[in-house]
Amino acid sequence: MSDVSFHDLSSLDATQRSSLLKRAEADLSVFVEKVRPIIQAVKDEGDAALIRFARELDKANVAEGGLQVSEAEFDAAFDKVEKDVVESIGFGIDNIRRFHEEQKPETMWLKEVRPGAYAGDRYTPIASVALYVPRGKGAFPSVTMMTSVPAVIAGVPQIAIVTPPTSDGSVDAATLVAARLAGVHTVYKCGGAQAVAAVAYGTETVKPALKIVGPGSPWVVAAKSELSSIINTGLPAGPSEAIIFADDSVDGGLAALDLLIEAEHGPDSSAYLVTHSRKVAEAALAALPQHWSRMTEQRVEFSRAVLTGKRGGIVLTASLEDSYRFINDYAPEHLEILSKEPFAHLGHITEAAEILMGPHTPVTLANFVLGPNAVLPTSRWARTYGPLSVTDFVKRSSVGYVTSAAYPELAKHARRLARYEGFSSHENAVSEIRDRYLAG
């Protein structure tokens, strides 16, 4: 397919190469201006604003008093979803739970740093969190699974899902099934900027939360940015992105198959096949039409927009080292290492949020059922952030305990440093003044 973007990295100058790293980063300032009146309306009007915006923005008819999913709606969801899909949701949740249980930190640890002086950490769950589950380009029970399971494992006492309603005012049935199987029992029918505002400020129905996590549209991202001083907005998760890295040991047709996984998400996604093998690159190009013939019309449209645009296609490198360098510069959300010897490449990759190794580990498995979390940092934030985890739902407190035997030595050194930095009350608190109180 000659219209698929093909980038020979060795022929590009620094500016052209840098342009390949750009994502679909919307001008948030435009959206911030748009979300401000929405946020203010929700703050001032509560439920009435949510119902109005559901009608105006989501084209959904949510009845007054119907913003929270009822028990009857939860029960009905299991009848609406095919049994094999319910089974697969349960299978995925089981694996996600097994993986995330390993992340749960011990409640407290203490280290004796000096005889009689102890320092450590204590972990407690965040009191309340909101989980954002988008609906813009489809239904995503998988996002419900990925956000709900670690929150439940962390022991968060108040967990609520916010998700845009459908036109009849209901919530996607599979999303409700996933919520119930994961252990979440509160779901609110609101999405977009209005949902972020609702969980930040609270309404008559929606309880306020201390943190919100989950991917969303530019409207959601802008609302999170605007409300970041009110509610913790979690890791930056924007439009989906992936690199399929293939060496010369795999078929280019397989690389093309996996390239389309990310490209079909939407026209704002980013997806590259990176290889130093021209044979693999050409085979991938040749295989794309056959793969497109097996996709729905909408997903073909989405993936073609990505692969023929500025944020997708094939990147041919001069060597393996050049491939590694490009991948680390790009810092992808998802990285597949397509190779018969994937572990030989792993040590060269330092900047990727998710690394899936070998021809039997496509992104599809990780998105749904493998276990690692699929809510991941995008837009090169993999350089400083990691995947959503149990630790995103707990907070850490430092703990210190000093015995009477250890106190004098620590006090002596602390007193010297307090005096040097000019803090007289600090110094007094570990001086003979304290000794007199302790003795008396």
From Swiss-Prot:
Enzyme class: oxidoreductase
This enzyme's EC code(s): 1.1.-.-
Residues that coordinate or bind Zn(2+): 265, 426
A GO MF term: metal ion binding
Keywords recorded for this protein, A-Z: Metal-binding, Oxidoreductase, Zinc
InterPro entries with a match to the protein in the record: Ald_DH/histidinol_DH, Histidinol_DH_CS, Histidinol_DH_monofunct, Hstdl_DH
GO BP terms: L-histidine biosynthetic process
PROSITE patterns: HISOL_DEHYDROGENASE
The family this protein is said to belong to: Belongs to the histidinol dehydrogenase family.
The protein, known as: Histidinol dehydrogenase homolog 2
Source lineage: Bacteria, Pseudomonadati, Pseudomonadota, Alphaproteobacteria, Hyphomicrobiales
